[in-house]
């Protein structure tokens, strides 16, 4: 079983970014995109999802779309964050922490 997790942190005030809608899309080799799962960050700004990955799933690309426009109520430039990645090991834990602000973001791959 694979695990995908993320932690969204608000760089403006140092809090956890709770209530942010997150969509994980799967993109197959033909470029066809489908929603793999949807969720929302919890009070701690986190998402966590366990799932089975088939061999075909491991050959796909994925994108995590974080809908940040509603989270920041003032004027902002970044309305959503899109991170593209792969999950090639069906038994691995994938962790994508993101520091967000109204006008920028920073991400790293954590294992």
What are these regions (language model features)?
Residues 2-88, 93-97:
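Beta-strand-dominated extracellular/periplasmic modules and repeats
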Residues 94-111:
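Compositionally biased low-complexity segments at domain edges in trafficked proteins
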